[in-house]
Amino acid sequence: MDAGFNIASICIHKGEEPVISGTDGICNIFFAGCNLHCLYCQNHEISQSGSVIRSPGMELEKILDQVVSILSEGIPAVGFVSPSHVVPQVKAIIKGLNLRGYKPVTVYNTNSYDKKETIRGLSGLIDVYLPDYKYVNWEIATEYSDAEDYPAIALKAIKEMYYQKGSTLTFDEDGRAENGLVIRHLVLPGLIVESKDVLKSIAEELSTGVHLSLMSQYHPTSQVINHPILGRSLYKEEYEAVVEAMGVMGFRNGWVQDMDSNQNYRPDFSKEHPFE
């Protein structure tokens, strides 16, 4: 088990939703690799090329040492980023922390390309699910993420998360999420209809009471800079149209981003602290 922990970064990250990061940040564990192949991935340095792996084959005890060091600074939560392909390792880290006497809020930060059974097996271990619901159209999923079955698989996974957590999001005294579900959606340029269809799917298949995070932080990476659609940033009018649809459909809980957020999320995983 220990030989398989390929870690891209373990760091304090302050760029998640306010209820996830709080003011001090969350201890995020960024795993190398990914089970999706999104053309526009903002973390492509570690998810696709695999060229930036700060700690290949890292031992569990060393991971726990680093996480405990951050938790000891007063950070109350641990996030597992891109964990779908390493779920046994996620479980091992949580159980290892518990054995050391630490029970932080655990956040499963996923692209939602998870089997329903996998999510079911995380019940009782994960406090907050933070899934990204990317597409409902299989053709778009195929073109942009090479995953024709993404819409069906993601919906089943998110339904299981909803079954476990419902629409209620509970908070600690500092306003940080302690338990529940927050569904993310990144609005992509030129795909406004798709974004509205994603919101419609959530409303019809789950509830308009769930907490949503509608993200505007898309930035064209070097991978897609010449792409006819993905090669530009999101227009303000495009994002505002999706925000308006969110309100019209009756969603009442969630967060939206400022349009300059695409300047804030540009990690450099060759650095010890990618977000500084």
Model-derived features with residue positions:
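Hydrophobic faces of well-ordered beta-strands that scaffold small-molecule active sites
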Residues: C27, V78, T106-Y108, Y129-P131, ...
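Short glycine-enriched, charge-decorated loop/helix-capping segments at active-site entrances
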Residues: E45-S55, E143-E148, N226-S233
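Conserved radical SAM core fold
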Residues: S47-Q48, V87, S112-K115, Y133-P151, ...
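Non-cysteine beta-strand/loop elements that form the S-adenosyl-L-methionine
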Residues: S123-W138, G209-Y218
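Auxiliary Fe-S-binding modules of radical SAM enzymes
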Residues: G166-E276
